[in-house]
Regions:
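C-terminal transmembrane beta-barrel domains of outer membrane proteins
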Residues: 19-191
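Hard-cation-handling environments
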Residues: 1-16
Length: 191
């Protein structure tokens, strides 16, 4: 639960000719409820099923900083992170991994996923949509390893290819070069 207070914040009446608020009908007095959850289970040896779901509910028109998105690495990863957001939203993502341990410190895990969600604006302007729905499917490969020689670090990498669909032209602006397809490459090193 998040509650906005009007202490020290600007309102639309105080903007004047200065910098406008991020949403013309939003105020700093708001309440929204957000829930994000995940569930992981291994139904068979070396298979992992992951389910991520969540959303946000509000009766208010929110400033951009309080809106929630349905895109991201554990959500609809086939779209640019932050490309689809709204005052209210829901998303769900299911993923199945098959893990191959190549050594004690190195594993490779191909996976397939599907995801969908919708973001809503409570009081859209003439240039905005009331709702933007999206879905994506894809496959990827995760590589994880541990290096015990220098600083005892964990190294992980991911390559994912996705096919996307969305209302309006969101998929066109998110994926200009790949024709509604998205390639995600990440690498992380944890000490």
């Amino acid at each position: 639960i998040s509650k906005g207070l009007e202490l020290g914040s600007r309102s639309n009446s105080q903007v004047g000719n200065g910098t406008p608020l991020s949403r013309s009908t939003a105020t700093s007095n708001f309440t929204h409820f957000r829930l994000n959850t995940n569930y992981t289970v291994s139904p068979f040896k070396d298979f992992i099923f992951m389910l991520n779901a969540g959303g946000q509910y509000t009766l208010n028109d929110l400033l951009n900083s309080e809106q929630t998105g349905i895109t991201g690495e554990q959500r609809l990863s086939g779209f640019t992170s932050g490309a689809i957001s709204g005052d209210e939203a829901w998303y769900v993502r299911g993923q199945v991994n098959k893990q191959y341990r190549l050594s004690k410190n190195f594993s490779v895990s191909p996976y397939v996923y599907t995801a969908g969600g919708t973001a809503y604006l409570n009081q859209p302007t003439a240039a905005e949509r009331t709702a933007t729905s999206a879905k994506s499917i894809g496959l990827g490969l995760e590589v994880t390893g541990n290096d015990e020689y220098f600083f005892d670090k964990s190294i992980s990498a991911k390559v994912e290819f996705s096919k996307n669909w969305a209302t309006g032209n969101i998929e066109n602006t998110s994926s200009v070069r790949l024709n509604r397809e998205h390639l995600l490459v990440t690498m992380a090193m944890r000490f």
